[in-house]
Amino acid sequence: MRDLRSDLKELYRALSQTPATEGGRTVMFMSARSGEGVSSVATAFALLAAEQARKPVWLIDLDLKRNHLFNTFAVGPFADAFGGVGPPYSASLKTQPFFSVEPELPEATQGLGLFTAHRVGETRLMVTQFDASRLKAGHGIRIKT
């Protein structure tokens, strides 16, 4: 993964000038195929926003089973450069989850601690992690639409 922050400064400047809604801004980066660099772009943009923003910036990886973005900050060059990831915080924000586990987990465990956010070093960046280790064989995760 490459650090593309310098390439994204103009995009950040343009987006930061648009009015924010009550809860802030949401920016989504998507690609048609794997390997197109969307993880590098999203990570660099989140780091740039975290450097400039007054509030925390959340980097949410929708590839829940792989946790690629979390792992990027947990070990390796980005972990070394930014200080690794801190302890988990609930990422539920007291709302219904945007994902479902099928077949459903027992009610006592559904959603509890499955999706967490971790502060990256001393930055304002929070990166998410889905605890796929709690799923059993045959369980799947779906993003709700």
Where are the language model's segments positioned?
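Hydrophobic positions on the alpha1 helix immediately C-terminal to the Walker A/P-loop
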Residues: 41
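P-loop/Walker-type NTP enzyme "switch/lid" segment
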Residues: 2-5, 9, 13, 20, ...
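Gly/Ala-rich phosphate-binding loop of Rossmann-like dinucleotide-binding domains
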Residues: 46, 50-51
